Amino acid sequence: PSSAFNSPFCTTNSGAPVFNNNSSLTVGARGPVLLEDYHLVEKLANFDRERVPERVVHARGASAKGFFEVTHDITHLTCADFLRAPGVQTPVIVRFSTVIHERGSPETLRDPRGFAVKFYTREGNFDLVGNNFPVFFIRDGMKFPDMVHALKPNPKSHIQENWRVLDFFSHVPESLHMFTFLFDDIGIPQDYRHMDGSGVHTFTLINKAGKSTYVKFHWKPTCGVKSLLEDEAARVGGANHSHATQDLYDSIAAGNYPEWKLFIQTMDPDHEDRFDFDPLDVTKTWPEDILPLQPVGRLVLNKNIDNFSNENEQLAFCPSIVVPGVYYSDDKMLQTRIFSYSDTQRYRLGPNYLQLPANAPKCAHHNNHYDGSMNFMHRDEEIDYFPSRYDPVRHAEKYPIPSTMCTGKREKCVIQKENNFKQPGERYRSFTPDRQERFIRRWVETLSDPRITYEIRSIWISYWSQADKSLGQKLASRLNVRPSI
């Protein structure tokens, strides 16, 4: 910061002393305010611009800092430096969030929760940008803007309405699995400390020999998963609409540090055809009895952020930010997010958002990305191109990336193994009877919206009947709709 921050008296942004920070410059005691009062103009102009645009999703959130520590050796799977050996610690910043609702909205609403981790590794940052649920609503990013529009408030009234949500998703049967999480008891986490996290997508690990392995990341809280039922959520949210943010902050301040264990599931890409689903389908989970959870490390949050604007609002996560040893897969939704997230950060924070302290790597870094809006990196080099015989900068040592052969014709199509109903049915049947009853009640209430047509109601009953026949029958009976299957 500027030395002006150490001044015993107020100054302007340029450092000039301010002898009266309470009164405007006027013509006499009661006269008009003068435009030449530069300090007033500067103060108001700064105030008018002190909020960056709200995130289009994940606007409501809370951040904390800490470390990730490797506890188990997985160097046979990846050459990632931050996973090089047990005991290695990497500083992190984590942001939890709700997804659909606005900044400042209650943290007790039924909504997925974001779980994003930025690792400041010795080989650059790694952003693992996930949610608390292991699946997603859609598998192709082409649908993403429409999906968010449907989940967001009505553009005419600015009221979030169930009929819009169920109308859109009546065209998207792949969403059923996600709804078995969202409409389940875990649809409203008790707070951020008591919820799972997931990388959601299938990623790729690459070892030193260049062998690729599909991977899914899972965070498990050491204090267990706890959720709120509707009456509890109404009571908690009515008393404090920022209860989860306060719980996170107060717990860390008291030395009760939240901790999660990191587990992975891995799959040999050569074995992907052995399953009745596509392993790159983000609407599917991998069976843990066949692909068991393997421990990797632990995440500990032991420091609250110092400034909400700098370390929460200006904090930017992008799934495109990976490190050697970790790579993407051909998951269509992940491929879309690789572009979309960095693009929205450039809109929200400016083209140099990665220079902001919370987003900048903590390791040495160099490139020729110069100037532009909001650039504040002081550089005095004469060489701003590559290569050059006047500059010793060279290529880094080569590291392995996936070498999969891609063949096929250009086409817009759905994946072959959609299998939209099996996993939702299995998950519903895993619920206890009282949990099933609460799930049914939530769907009956939602499908009873007066603007939902008989056709849409029938489609949803058909979908749930294909997932589980008894579930469809119960919904049809309570809604007085004849099941079509």
Curated annotation (Swiss-Prot):
GO terms classed as biological process: hydrogen peroxide catabolic process; response to hydrogen peroxide
UniProt entry tagged with the keyword Iron: yes
Active site per UniProt: H58, N131
Subcellular location: Peroxisome
GO MF annotation terms: catalase activity; heme binding; metal ion binding
Listed Pfam families: Catalase, Catalase-rel
Keywords, alphabetical: Heme, Hydrogen peroxide, Iron, Metal-binding, Oxidoreductase, Peroxidase, Peroxisome
Keyword Iron listed: yes
EC number(s) recorded for this UniProt protein: 1.11.1.6
Binding site for heme: Y341
InterPro entries, per database record: Catalase, Catalase_AS, Catalase_clade1/3, Catalase_core, Catalase_haem_BS, Catalase_immune_responsive, Catalase_sf
Expression induction: By paraquat and 3-aminotriazole.
Known cofactor(s): heme
Gene Ontology CC terms: peroxisome
Signal peptide start-end: none
Described purpose of this protein according to its UniProt entry: Occurs in almost all aerobically respiring organisms and serves to protect cells from the toxic effects of hydrogen peroxide.
Family the entry assigns: Belongs to the catalase family.
Subunit structure: Homotetramer.
Protein name as it appears in the record: Catalase isozyme 1
Gene: CAT1
